[in-house]
């Protein structure tokens, strides 16, 4: 599992260099997120409420989630991501394009190591994508007690 207790870092520049991110402010970084797309078939429907899990495991995040302004901003941002960046049809097209590039390599991998069903993994990820927006809404409502559109 990638988040909330793994694959995260904080970073900042030590001196203000005048660039957008060179202002000495602390920034959050999430990396190595292969589990976030259900790559291994662990959560086909996106039922695991990672937002609530993060609240349970991180006292600072939980405290922020008790602030009405932060809650609304977080909910709005998550829904913007669901509507734009995570739009199911667009994400599926990108996934198909990536799968087409990697499929020949995965066939070689499968011959060599005996596993690696690309088509099955692509189906799992597409199923996850199709359910993601409704699950994001559900998790926001359950974890933040906010009704979203």
Show the residue positions of the predicted features.
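Middle-to-C-terminal accessory/interaction subdomains
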Residues: 1-149
